[in-house]
Amino acid sequence: MAEEESRLGAGQGTGAALGREDDGVSTAPVQGPDAVGHLRSLLRPLVRICVAVMGVVALLAAGASIWAWTVSAGHIEIAGEGSGDGAAARAPVAIVLGAAVHADGQPSPWLAHRLDAAAELYTSGRVEAILVSGDNRRAGYDEPTVMRSYLLSRGIPEQAIAVDYAGFDTYDTCVRARRIFGIERALLVTQDFHEPRAVAICRSVGLDVDGVGDSRARSDRIGWTVSWTRERAAAIKAVVDVVSRRDPTLGRQETSVKEAVAWTREHRR
């Protein structure tokens, strides 16, 4: 009897072992090279998806950048160099695009460079008014007011300065300049790496602009490189904005630019 039970037990053990082998299921953890291979097999599809997405984004960015360069070609000069296709350009007004301001009420260095370039355009007689356009949506943060104060400190008459408090991005500034301030012709002042996109946007929404780009940001190699790279992605948004023709914050019509131009013409006689 004991011998028969022993044979039965052995048979059950063999059957169980065979059953586990037939099922192909192992309860032992995957270790060593097998674990690495298993992880790779899981990650491989994810990596392929990421590469595909990055490729699509790169193609879109390249196409959008080519659009910006094409539309802006022949309409950009570098401030202070006296060269470039738009070197002899004049306009009734210079539009200065906003940028970061500090908590102490001072413009960031790059914004100060833009304002310096605009002040030079005014004092040299190439424009008759300056429109500063920026963001003031957050409490305690007011780009246009800081920009105006800086120009006043540079000796620009307050009567020659107009203010756009709803220039939340470049597209908004361009559309509002045309539809709210009634500007038809302008010089657009920003950093040189930003000019192709900015000029392309403005010209695409019906505003006749030439860009005056400040190149002093190039001395900050890291910042300039990061911003130049960012421009490639921002060009995609620019194309979407132009194609969709979205309406920015508009509000009532403004006459401040026309009044500033008229004041300067009267006092330059």
Each language-model region and where it sits:
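Low-complexity, intrinsically disordered Ser/Thr/Pro- and acidic-rich segments
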Residues: A10-Q12
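Short linear elements at protein peripheries
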Residues: R245-R269
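A structural signal for short, hydrophobic/glycine-enriched beta-strand patches
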Residues: A2-R7, G19-R20, G24-V30, W67-T229
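N-terminal type II signal-anchor transmembrane helix
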Residues: Q31-G84
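Intrinsic disorder/low-complexity detector
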Residues: G24-V25, V36, A233
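A transmembrane-helix-recognition feature enriched in membrane-embedded lipid enzymes
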Residues: T225-D247
